[in-house]
């Protein structure tokens, strides 16, 4: 049901804005700083005992990404055969970037299984073995976006897994996609969407090297926006 609601929001004139305020006991406050783009904002406050972080996101509205879609022949030729084939499948019938992103999501959902094993995470390797973790998902999606001339960058941080009001920050990787007109959006190839359950880490701080920390939910809210 949740996946269906996210799909309907992604393709409707409506978007969902979610806000999550958390307190985390991180002993490395230099790991985080304020950050924002077109579908996410993170504001960090140092408080006694840790950090209070205000997180706000908007549902990724694929319907609004009606940018022209075209294969970049030179970029495509530079990719391994497995990536070229994946590009053809993900882009089948696509007329816009929104179509292509949806195609990438469907392709990954059907062709790549999540696996935490210590396997190669390069795009071609993940496609060949049919499995990978968040780094592999991000690498495949980044390669497929490059095939159509869309720049992106990997983002390191944490996904906030929640249970009974407490949050467990899990090391994670996703993409920031650069759109025409200077717009930037987050896209998570593994979870197929983006929400306020993320903490963005500063560059140069691999999340997996950070001492495990935890937190609690301070407040939350959601609202539907008609755009």
Language model segments and positions:
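Intrinsically disordered, low-complexity N-terminal segments that are enriched in acidic
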Residues: 9-61
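Short intrinsically disordered coil segments
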Residues: 36-39, 66-73, 189-192
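Hydrophobic/aromatic-rich core segments of domains that either
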Residues: 139-215
